[in-house]
Amino acid sequence: MSGGHQLQLAVLWPWLLMATLHAGFGHTGRVLAAAVESERSAEQKAVIRVIPLKMDPTGKLNLTLEGVFAGVAEVTPAEGKLMQSHPLYLCNASDDDNLEPGFISIVKLESPRRAPRPCLSLASKARMAGERGANAVLFDITEDRSAAEQLQQPLGLTKPVVLIWGSDAAKLMEFVYKNRKAYVWIELKEPPAGANYDVWILLTVVGTVFVIILASVLRIRCRPHHSRPDPLQQRTARAISQLATRRYQAGCRRARAEWPDSGSSCSSTPVCAICLEEFSEGQELRVISCLHEFHRTCVDPWLYQHRTCPLCMFNIVEGDSFSQAPAASPSYQEPGRRLHLIRQHPGHAHYHLPSAYLLGPSRTSVARTPRPRPFLPSQEPSMGSRHQRLPRTSHLRAPEEQQHLAVSPHPYAQGWGLNRLRCTSQHPAACPVALRRARPHESSGSGESYCTERSGYLADGPASDSSSGPCHGSSSDSVVNCTDVSLQGIHGSSSTFRSSLSSDFDPLVYCSPEGDLQGKGIQPSVTSRPRSLDSVVPRGETQVSSHIHYHRHRHHHYKRQFQWHGRKPGPETGIPQSMPAASHTQLEPSLPDQQLITPNPTASSMLPNPQRPRALTEPAPGLAEASSPSPSPKPNPSGLLNLQKSSLTVRHPHRKRRGGPSEPLPTSLPPDLTVHTACPVFPHYSPRLAYPWPPEVHPLMFRPPGPDRRLLHEVPGPCYSSSQPVWLYLNPCQPLGPCLPGEGHSKWTFDSPEGRRCPYSHCQVLPAQPGSEEELEELCEQAV
């Protein structure tokens, strides 16, 4: 039954009770009323005792009669000798009879039919009797009952008037008729003692019950309606009661050891984030499940109202931690999203992570789903329908493909410090990269845990001065790269030129979701450097480039300590017109003719602008693989010596320049490019290759052993693909092999400790082309 029905019943049931009492005690009520009326009349009754003057030893002649006092006279007791009087006697005013006063006169009234016209009224006769010396008058109204009404009108007579009728009147008249002398006492009849008590007791009980019922009704109606306690409030109170509390102690190190990710910091005095007051000795602190500490008096009201941590929004009721929330909505992993981080120092990206991200991955080999980093996504302005990109996820390899990947380490790979690099993929999206969580020493000490990753890109801004030469980052960042500022990182546009600086993500920030390795026994050991998302185009995508409007930063220092042999073909440089702006990988013409002339319509159809030559280009990722006549081609030793790299990276004493991959021109591609080279592996998806940056942004730099040798993780595998721009130190050396007619020898080789030359397509250099340093500087300035 609802509360409204209960209230209505509470209001109505007193009235129902009263009706029940009236129905049950109706007869009793009427009897009670009659009793009260009789008691009222009883007070007017008189007791008439008649005692004969002659003593009767038996007492049978003694009479006790009842009568009623008339209203015309006073109700008082009286006594005297009994004397009969005729009605007509009382009409005579003469005093012929000398009667002794003090007698009781009895008058028997006749029927009104016999005396229609009485001489005097009954009241007058009663006065007349009193005047003649009677102490009281007794009227027998047996034959005239109307006399009672006549005698009820009060006239103020001093002598009492008593009315008798019936049997009592007959007994008295019989005594008179026998001429017996008697003495009469008229007394007031006392009412019974218990009658009034019973009535008042009943009235008291009924009144008490009624009062109790009325009080109950008023209490129910006037009581405030308190709603049931909210279950969520109960859960919140229970969760707050289960939170830990502690007394603050000045020893910061011990406190930090107990709470590694607490809101306090050893670098400064801990402060309550709510009241902004420093913790003092002995204060009671509330420690939330996320290990943030506040004054108990400050945070408890907040927790009761919001149920979340004021800093990290950890829900104390639901238990949704900071690391679990992004897993449900990894919207920032979608294409066209930009990640916003706090940039506090040049060359570093600082982002806030919970303690779970600082503990490192599990040592087990069980594969888990990647946990993304908690950042705020925003839509990239330049992303359109034709810029949709496939999610960069790892793909499992079929067992039959893995059988062709077990090759021995190549000696050249060993010379580069990659003696454990293995060929694990033939698809650009097939090899996930080992991960690394933030090192504890890279976290800040401002009270929260911040992971400092090397961003690899330093834009012009208040915190950086690119005109001062090398980048001035923090002392711990030894690999900060100085590059031109790309407007694609701010506005975004579309063109056919692809650069490693154009990315779906913020150019100032490199970050990505973390996940465990999918290989067996693979454990991350070094940090991961972010890669540009435009540096690699997956195989299944349309190779649509993003236009890069390079801002001419004249203040950038382009040193002239390196050489560039040739900038464009034509009569000025002496290069044949058939050669492209940047040479592509060529194989020795010893393969079958049908392989040399096999067209590649897929690769050609994906080139948006084949008429525009590029200064820095390299083969598209899918050319060699799409044109391969066999699933696992064998390398050509003689052709490997003549492979040439299309993107040349030079050694600069102060900064390292970037080169972006671009699509080759179908009109200028030599037929040798259609031949499947040896082991076309795409390194940024290899599960055996671990870069010091998260997998979302893979390395833009791949360097041999040197000052930054720590950035490269040595993993097995002899192969490396040309689908990713590679940055290497180059030194003048002898050409790798015989040159074709009209081509000069390459004067650049890799700066490896052993002096080995890389035989693969991504490691080769451009052919020697004439050109001056001024042209090279102009080329670098325009970046076209």
Curated annotation (Swiss-Prot):
It catalyses: S-ubiquitinyl-[E2 ubiquitin-conjugating enzyme]-L-cysteine + [acceptor protein]-L-lysine = [E2 ubiquitin-conjugating enzyme]-L-cysteine + N(6)-ubiquitinyl-[acceptor protein]-L-lysine. Disruption phenotype: Conditional knockout mice lacking both Rnf43 and Znrf3 in intestine show a marked expansion of the proliferative compartment, resembling the effects of acute deletion of Apc. Pathway: Protein modification; protein ubiquitination. Disulfide bonds join C91-C119. GO terms for biological process: negative regulation of Wnt signaling pathway; protein ubiquitination; stem cell proliferation; ubiquitin-dependent protein catabolic process; Wnt receptor catabolic process; Wnt signaling pathway. Keywords: Cell membrane, Developmental protein, Disulfide bond, Endoplasmic reticulum, Glycoprotein, Membrane, Metal-binding, Nucleus, Signal, Transferase, Transmembrane, Transmembrane helix, Ubl conjugation, Ubl conjugation pathway, Wnt signaling pathway, Zinc, Zinc-finger. Residues 583-608 have a biased composition (Polar residues). It is an enzyme of class 2 (transferase). GO terms for molecular function: frizzled binding; ubiquitin-protein transferase activity; zinc ion binding. The chain crosses the membrane at residues 198-218. Its EC number is 2.3.2.27. It is a single-pass type I membrane protein. It is found in: Cell membrane; Endoplasmic reticulum membrane; Nucleus envelope. It holds the Pfam family zf-RING_2. Expressed in crypt base columnar cells of small intestinal epithelium. Crypt base columnar cells are small cycling cells residing between the terminally differentiated Paneth cells at crypt bottoms. Colocalizes with Lgr5-positive stem cells. Coiled coil: none annotated. A zinc finger (RING-type) spans 272-313. InterPro entries: RNF43_Znf_RING, Znf_RING, Znf_RING/FYVE/PHD, ZNRF-3_ecto, ZNRF3_Arkadia_E3_ligases. Belongs to the ZNRF3 family. PANTHER family: RING ZINC FINGER (PTHR16200). E3 ubiquitin-protein ligase that acts as a negative regulator of the Wnt signaling pathway by mediating the ubiquitination, endocytosis and subsequent degradation of Wnt receptor complex components Frizzled. Acts on both canonical and non-canonical Wnt signaling pathway. Along with RSPO2 and ZNRF3, constitutes a master switch that governs limb specification. Interacts with AKAP8L, NONO and SFPQ. Interacts with FZD5. Identified in a complex composed of RNF43, LGR5 and RSPO1. Interacts with RSPO2. Interacts with LMBR1L. This is E3 ubiquitin-protein ligase RNF43.
